[in-house]
A protein has these predicted regions:
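Sec/Tat signal peptide C-region and signal peptidase I cleavage site
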Residues: 20-25
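Short catalytic helix/loop segments, enriched in acidic residues and glycine
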Residues: 49-69
Length: 302
């Protein structure tokens, strides 16, 4: 077929303009990163995990570096927009001045969607950085679920879940898949057993609740960067973790008192001395209830 010169010129100009179009005019690739701290390389005790610990300030930097490595890997695979959730302790751990200016960060508590605040259906994939195993897992470093002091088990539709499972279910409500997790070997194995063949970046190997063999901070960042790039590249192969509804939430406390008092609520069923059951219409209603359970105190002040 012969193309008239004017039409040919118009076609060439159109293709040239398309090739140089700004990123905002092209398709976006949105990534959500939820960051915890117990699964950061080198973390083995409370000395690294909060302001009272003598190593905390250094390990805030290591946590920040691992999240930045995940961002770099995601961008190498084409990510154009990234939201980070600072989801450990007081939610004010990440050194935000070190982040690229186009990255946004969710900080502090409370939040209706807990460690996944800000997630919605516009995101393409989720990455977990610095995650740990569940409270029922005897293998993980600093293993717990939501509250190390108060909760003995959390179940969704009868399945005991780690925080990775809870947060994957929140993302799954919006049909967004989890594509990667970093942490110790127990956390990665537990998440992959629940969520399927997501990318796993193991940065330490657990010897017990307070001991591990660990990569150096630099080596852990290299591993996370590679895993994040692979995860975003494979995102189409990942399946969202979608729960059937209504969602049945079972929570077992270490003490009898919370279950006793919560059973006064008409929406709560006490299933044994230490356990309660709540049925939410979906995962969003369920996580909001769990956030209430783990955050409410009668003496709350601003």
């Amino acid at each position: 077929m012969r193309i008239a010169p004017r039409r040919l010129l118009a076609l060439v100009l159109f293709l040239a303009a398309s090739a140089t179009a700004p990123a905002s005019a092209q398709s976006k690739l949105k990534i959500y990163i939820s960051a915890d701290m117990e699964g950061i390389a080198g973390v083995v005790s409370g000395e690294q995990l909060g302001p009272s610990g003598f190593e905390y300030e250094r390990f805030r930097g290591f946590m920040t570096n691992e999240v930045l490595a995940a961002i770099e890997g995601a961008r190498a695979a084409g990510a154009t927009e990234i939201l980070v959730s600072d989801s450990h302790g007081n939610g004010q751990n990440l050194l935000i001045e070190r982040f690229p200016k186009d990255v946004q960060i969710v900080r502090s508590w409370p939040r209706p969607l807990a460690m996944m605040e800000g997630i919605d259906a516009s995101f393409d994939a989720v990455l977990f950085v610095g995650y740990h195993a569940s409270t029922v897992n005897p293998q993980g470093v600093r293993a717990h679920t939501m509250s190390s002091a108060n909760l003995a088990d959390v179940r969704l539709n009868g399945v005991s879940v780690p925080e990775a499972g809870l947060n994957a279910a929140i993302a799954g409500h919006y049909r967004v898949p989890v594509a990667m997790i970093s942490g110790d070997d127990a956390a990665v194995k537990e998440a992959q057993a629940l969520l399927g063949p997501i990318e796993g970046a193991i940065v330490k190997w657990s010897y017990g609740f307070h001991s591990a063999r660990t990569l150096t901070p630099e080596a852990s960042c290299d591993r996370i960067r590679e895993a994040a790039k692979a995860a975003v590249g494979r995102r189409a192969q990942m399946k969202p973790y979608v729960l059937t509804t209504p969602v049945t939430l079972d929570v077992r406390f270490k003490s009898y008192r919370p279950s006793e008092v919560l059973s006064y609520l008409p929406i709560v069923e006490r299933t044994d001395a230490h356990s309660i059951r709540f049925r939410g219409k979906d995962m969003i209603e369920t996580i909001r209830f769990l956030e209430f359970v783990t955050n409410y105190e009668p003496g709350l002040t601003p």
